[in-house]
Amino acid sequence: DRTASDSAALDSTIELLVRTKRSLPMAKLMTIPEAFAHRRDFPKKLKDLYTYANAVMESWDGPAAICGCHDQWAIAGMDRNGLRPLRYTLTNDFLIAGSETGMVEIDEAEILERGRVGPGQMIAVNFKEGKFYKDKEIKNKLSQSRPFGEWIKKIKHIDKLVQSVDEEFRDIQTSDLRRRMTSFGWTSEDMEIILHPMIASQKEAVGSMGDDTPIAVLSDNYRGLHHFFRQNFSQVTNPPIDSLRERVVMSLRTRIGNLSNILDEDQSQCDHLQLNSPVLSINQFKTLRQYMKDKVKIIDTTMDIQQENYHFKKELDRINKEAEEAVRSGYVHIILTDKSLSKSRVALPMILVTSSVHHYLIKKRLRTFISLNVQSAECLDVHYFAVLIGVGATSINAYMAQQAIAERHKKKLFGQLTYEECVERYIQSVNNGLLKIMSKMGISVVSSYRGGCNFEAIGLSRNLMSEYFPSMSSKISGMGLKGLEQKSLFAHNKAYSDDVINLPIGGFYRYRKDGEKHSFEGTSIHILQTAVGTNNYSLYKK
């Protein structure tokens, strides 16, 4: 039921699991597991159990304190962050669980134990055994119910598969790289203010608050599609997370492969590749491609502008149909790539393509059968990665950003850092940024953020939103698909018709004479100061 609440969806999922012979404690553990990835004090058997549970299905983040009863079990459990109160009272005859200790009047002489259920924990009663289980006891019981340690050996880790440093793209011609960058709207400002600090400090660049530039739809310059989206933040129910001090409960681990039947319980559910992060280097993406073998369908996301009657709508329909046919033909992975970009082929905005394919496959009820991997030249800053993941991307390779790093490294702009270290620091800075963005929504794991569309569009038409971004809202309507096409073609033709020696200056973050317009540019401020100093009203009006 699409109109049902999150709580109703969770209830329905747990009900489905218990009706297929899984115990209620196991159903709770699979749907709302404890944070374990960064904890060194976790017993191996419990780690094996949670690793298996994460391989079977994506987890709920909460906040939630749940109580349930089915068959011979009654349970009470908490979400991984412990963001709801849950206390219990055990008597000679009863177990009472709820948000407060004193909900029910009980004779103190009857009370055996009082306590609280912590983050990710649960308590349980088995009616058949007549036994009360604390958190460690019930989880030890579950961890011994199946050979989970043997099953999870089928999970492959990408770091163990990477064998050598990939030299691909390292020697790309500077002129060709400049044209590609210009066609996507990159500027020298992006290189100096965005990319360089990410490698130098392993963090996003820090800037002052406020934005006095036009919103993307009103700008005269080409702005990437990610500029049309604003990140949502938690309000009322979901408290934000501190991504620095509460890192232990957060994870970017990503599984690559078909989601198996969640109703099964065997080792086949662990046959997939695990990534430590959805952000991949060129070398890691090449390794991923080798792992996929013949189970991958590569879809070109560029458009031939030499053919007659070309337009974005036609290309998006083609891409969607190719994706559907791939799933129905038994492919397990899809790669969306714009590597075919050339003078005669313009790249469609990757955010638009990814969202289109993701939602199209959801409508056809095929999305869970495939991983949606993106190889994008447009991707540079953390916000772009966040939007791509938010509209459904499983993994992302920003290959042109890595080419830009290689070019700057040749010029010795990163000091004593090796090229490999620069790439690692760039990916780490993106990872840190993704955790920060997720934390603003109170989301702990990237699988909960993926496809969640936690953004609000500004300046995109409602027809465009309803067709390609149906899970998002656009409070201010504006540019449609035709407008995006015209902007992309203008930037592309400009890049490939002119002799591009240097990137455009930009002027988005700092005012430049030939760059983006600013409300508070130098000339206006100078006139204002002069008008105030000379008490000149006519100059003030100017």
Each predicted region: which residue ranges?
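N-terminus-centric sequence/structural signature that marks the extreme N-terminus
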Residues: 1-19, 78-82, 89
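Conserved, mostly hydrophobic/aromatic
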Residues: 123, 338, 388, 445
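Alpha-helix-loop-beta-strand connector modules within alpha/beta enzyme cores
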Residues: 346-372, 425-432, 436
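Short, ordered loop/turn segments at secondary-structure junctions
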Residues: 128, 339-341, 377, 393, ...
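Conserved catalytic micro-motifs used in adenylation/nucleotidyl-transfer and phosphoryl/amide-
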Residues: 58-96
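Short beta-alpha connecting loops at secondary-structure transitions
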Residues: 1-2, 104-109, 369-374, 403-424, ...
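Catalytic cores of alpha/beta
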Residues: 378-392
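Flexible, glycine-rich loop/tail regions that form catalytic "lids" or insertion modules at the edges
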Residues: 17-64, 68-72, 99-103, 131-313, ...
